[in-house]
Amino acid sequence: MAKAYGATRALSGIDLTVESGRIFGFLGPNGAGKTTTIRILLDLIRPDAGAATVLGFDCQRQSLEVRRRVGYLPGDLRLYESMRGDEFLDFIDSFRPEKRDPAYRRALVDRLDLDLTRRIRALSKGNRQKLGLVQALLHRPNLLVLDEPTSGLDPIVQDEVVRLLEEAAGEGRTVFFSSHVLPEVEKISQSVAIIRAGKIVAIEDVAKLKARSVHVIEVTFAAPPPPGLLALPGVRELRRDGATVHFQAHDGVDAVLKAIATQRVLDLRTQQPSLEDVFLAYYTDPELPQEERRASA
């Protein structure tokens, strides 16, 4: 798919497939194209090129069928200010009377510690977010599309939201959520896509992505470091303190460890990359053109 707003490219030919029954994280900073992608999937805006299907339905020609099966939480959540929370959920329930489940609704409200008796205009950002989450989860949709779902929530409620999403996936439903809170994505996602300046630069299972991504290694040699070590493909020196070298290995550690094994080593430490390390590696890639680097900021 591709989408531009005037001279600004929001999406540049992205190709993305999400398997059903999984929790899929969509990563990128503000302005990278996450929200534009979500809006196209829900037919809230139209792409300039390309097509998309959700649950087997064409996003444009069969958008009503898509929406019947999707629970959506927008990043710019807007609610009916004059309604109470319970009135708003009654309103949402009225669109899907066959899926009304008062017991499940009460459970969601209790778990998120939400007061439904107050007018929406009087709710804090966090409580509005809770209400938005309840309406998205309410009818147990086949697919949850959530744009920054834990925004404005305190850590205790964030943990409860994570449990709700894990339960949804455990029931065979799909969770597609965008976020820039990397520890949260790492904690619950099975797969992730990283979008940069409107392009998908990585799509992979979280464990595989981390395993073949950057490792930070610190080695203290008994003698000066071998000159060939830092010449290995994918090895980038960070700093050197006498016989101790700190460097990054971007193409796995096998070749690096073999080179180190030919020397007398006094100390060796390696740090398994977090998802944040992986993400930052993509966003600090020196091969990224300057215009794209600015666009993704």
Predicted regions and their residues:
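Catalytic Walker B motif of ABC-type/P-loop ATPase nucleotide-binding domains
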Residues: 144-148
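Conserved ABC nucleotide-binding domain
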Residues: 102-122
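ABC transporter nucleotide-binding domain
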Residues: 161-248
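Hydrophobic anchor residue at the start of the ABC signature
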Residues: 133
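Conserved catalytic motifs of ABC-family nucleotide-binding domains
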Residues: 140
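Short, charged/small-residue-rich alpha-helical element at the C-terminal edge
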Residues: 215-289
